[in-house]
Design a protein with these regions (language model features):
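Substrate-binding/catalytic groove segments of enzymes
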Residues: 132-133, 183-194
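Acidic helix/loop microenvironments that form the catalytic cleft of cell-wall polysaccharide enzymes
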Residues: 119-127, 190-204
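Beta/coil-rich, acidic/histidine-enriched accessory regions frequently appended to metallopeptidases
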Residues: 5-9, 167-171, 197-303
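Juxtacatalytic substrate-recognition/specificity segment
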Residues: 2-114, 125-134, 142-150, 154-172, ...
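Active-site catalytic microenvironments for nucleophilic, acid-base chemistry
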Residues: 107, 128, 182-186, 198
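Alpha-helix N-cap and coil->helix boundary residues
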Residues: 42, 112, 116-117, 190-191, ...
Length: 303
């Protein structure tokens, strides 16, 4: 049974370098998702890649200035090319993987999957099967989860559609990914596939949970909160010292107090080693190492 092919539409100047990589990565994701979701796509996947972010924004939402990286409409997905954004602004391969997961969750449910599960599965697939594996969560998301800002699973769509505080959409993406991670660990990946099947038949979140894992949303929310505490309790407890050390490292580096910058940055990174957001302690740490002539350490820090 031959897999449907991938059609790539992109700027001719970039296609020689990028198109083979796109086809290979899209093909790998399709081989993986076809097996995992037990679903064969019926038509080719069309991947449109824009080397100008404003063109992409107008094509996908009808307005420039949009902050999205990729958008999926069934078996057509549109995304920025690596050259349309600053270096290090996003990992391009992970974004493609994320969007390809949407193709499967949308198509396999006849587009009935709720936003929270489609986004959750895409984030979860980035972490589990994507080109850069491992759970990666920004500090502000940990802070929101520690402050009990996680929505109940039956309300989670609201966090995407009607956010009530800054960064709630991003927090909801991460929470949805963690909900999928939790279901997989506690009940097994198959239950996520069962839920997709239920949504495809028109069930709501409450009914899909009941069929797949036999519990109501309120009970699920309680167990999910326990899971967060178990997984990230140490990080939650360390958020205040993390934030203080992070700030201290920046301040010390701006004053050229390199010893303090190194000590503070290392304290912050002990708590959140994956902190690569704006204001990351890796920046003052590398600055200090270079300033003290520790060029090899500086290079390692920036990698």
């Amino acid at each position: 049974n031959s897999a449907p092919q991938v059609v790539v539409r992109m700027n001719r100047k970039e296609s020689a370098v990028l198109a083979p990589y796109v086809r290979r990565l899209a093909g790998q994701s399709m081989a993986s998702f076809q097996k995992r979701y037990r679903f064969q796509l019926k038509s080719p996947v069309v991947i449109e890649i824009y080397n100008n972010h404003e063109d992409f924004a107008v094509r996908t939402a009808g307005m420039p200035g949009l902050g999205l990286l990729g958008v999926t409409f069934g078996n057509v997905l549109a995304m920025d090319s690596p050259s349309s954004r600053a270096v290090n602004e996003f990992h391009w391969g992970s974004t493609l993987w994320h969007e390809m997961a949407h193709v499967y969750t949308l198509e396999s449910t006849g587009h009935r999957v709720p936003r929270w599960l489609s986004e959750g599965m895409s984030v979860y697939e980035e972490w589990r099967t994507g080109p850069i594996k491992g759970i990666s969560i920004p500090g502000y998301v940990y802070a929101a989860l520690a402050a009990n800002k996680a929505l109940g699973v039956a309300e989670l769509d609201r966090g995407f559609i009607r956010p009530e505080y800054e960064q709630q959409v991003q927090v909801s993406y991460m929470q949805a990914g963690l909900v999928c991670e939790f279901i997989d660990r506690r009940w097994g990946f198959d239950k996520l596939v069962t839920m997709l099947g239920e949504f495809g038949r028109g069930a709501d979140t409450s009914a899909a949970l009941k069929t797949a894992i036999g519990i109501a949303p309120a009970d699920f929310d309680r167990q999910f909160r326990e899971f967060l505490q178990q997984e990230f309790g140490t990080v939650f407890a360390g958020l205040k010292p993390w934030s203080e050390s992070r700030r201290a490292a920046m301040t010390a580096a701006s004053r050229k107090d390199w010893k303090t910058a190194i000590a503070s940055a290392q304290s912050a990174l002990k708590i959140l080693p994956n902190d690569v957001e704006d204001g990351s302690p890796y920046v003052p740490l590398a600055q200090a190492q270079y300033a003290l002539g520790e060029n090899q350490q500086g290079r390692t820090t920036l990698e």
